Amino acid sequence: GHLVIRGPGNGNREALTLEEVADKLQKLYRLPPMPALALRILRLTANTDATARELAELIEFDPSLTAQIMRYARSALFNYPGQVNSVQEAVTRVLGFDRVAHIALGIASVRAFEVPRHGILGMDNFWRHSLYCAFLCQIIAPRCGAEKGLGYLCGLLHNFGLLLVGHLFPAEFDELNELREANPEASMHSLEQQVFGQGNGQEILSVGHGAIGGILHRLWQLPDPVVKAAGVHQQSGYHGEHENYVLMVQLANAL
C-alpha cells in the first residue's frame, strides 16, 4: 500500500515529529527485530572480558559469516602478507577484535532486510559504501576525540535506514533507486523528498532515511553515538549530542 499517513482534519497539519514517526512506524508496520546472531555479537562486544576465541567461535557457528570475514581478512584492503587460515587468526593477526565484531554485527544485522542486491542503492553497493565509510571513520576518529571502534560502527551502520525503506516499501525503493541512478550528483534528501515528501507533510518517510535508521537503531538498543550518527547524518550543520561522531560520518560520506 501507499505509505502516506494522513492525520485528521483538512490535511494542513504540520509535518510529523520524529517521535510521531517512530510511533506510527512501530504501530503500522512490522519492524524487523535484530537477528539473533547479531544480538549475540552485540552482547559479546559489550563484555570487556570477551576473548578473540569467543568471538571466533560465535562467528564460526555461521558458515556464510565465516566465509565473509575470511574474505575481508585476505583482501587487498588490509594487505596482510601472511596466510590467514581461521577466523581466530583473522581476529588476532589482521583485523583486530573490534573490527571483526563490528563487521560481523553489520553482516548479521542486514539479514533482517529483504532488499535487492543490484542497483546503485542495492545491497552490494550498500556494503561497499558502508565498509568504505567505516574504514574512513576509524582513521578520522582519533582526530575528532572519538573512539575508533565506535567510529567504525557508526560508519558501518549509518545507512541502515535505506535498508528499512527498501524492506518495508519496495515499490518506492525501486523508484528511489532509479532516481539515484539518473541523478548521481543530487542529494539523497532531495531525491527522497521527490519520492516520499510530495503531500502535506504527513508522509512518515519524508523525514529521510537517516532518521528512519536512527529509529531502528534505537529500537535495537545500539550505542547512543550509532543511533545519533545514523539519525542526523543527513542534517548539515548539526550541533548537539555526539556531534563528533555525526561529523565523522558526514565527512566520510562526502569523501
Spans of features found by a protein language model:
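Conserved alpha-helical "signature site"
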Residues: 1-255
